[in-house]
Amino acid sequence: MRNNSTLIFVLGSLLAFVGPVSCGQAASEQKASYGTRVKYQAGQKIEFPDFTVEYVGERRKTMPVYPRGFLYYDFKVIKGNSEKVISWTTGTGIIDPTDFEFDGKSYYLELRRSHKLGKLNDNEFVIWQGRFGSK
């Protein structure tokens, strides 16, 4: 009886440790579809049908003609050995999507506001297939 109690205790402890670890790993990756709101955070990988997206972070770039600078939000698009960084900014205040090409296909990324879905939360983006304005 004592051996069974020890075995149950060891297995229970192992499950208590492995369960949250595996759930945490699953939470760091999510699947998404084109044309849907997607929540993002730094370091999280989001799997779309044609590629994976990872939010890298934000950066400010200043220029002599605009010393205040522009705030850029950078996303890394990955598929196999191919990788590309997509940068979105409001620039001087125009909130438009960023067109990009990856693996021979056209897409666009929306932040802050989607032309079809409306206002987006600070931690949401939308990726559409095709070029913005061509639909």
Each model region followed by its residue ranges:
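Surface-exposed, beta-sheet-biased, low-hydrophobicity segments with strongly acidic/polar composition
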Residues: 23-135
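Bacterial N-terminal signal peptides that target proteins for export
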Residues: 1-10
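Generic low-polarity alpha-helical segments
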Residues: 1, 18-23
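Bacterial N-terminal signal peptides
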Residues: 10-19
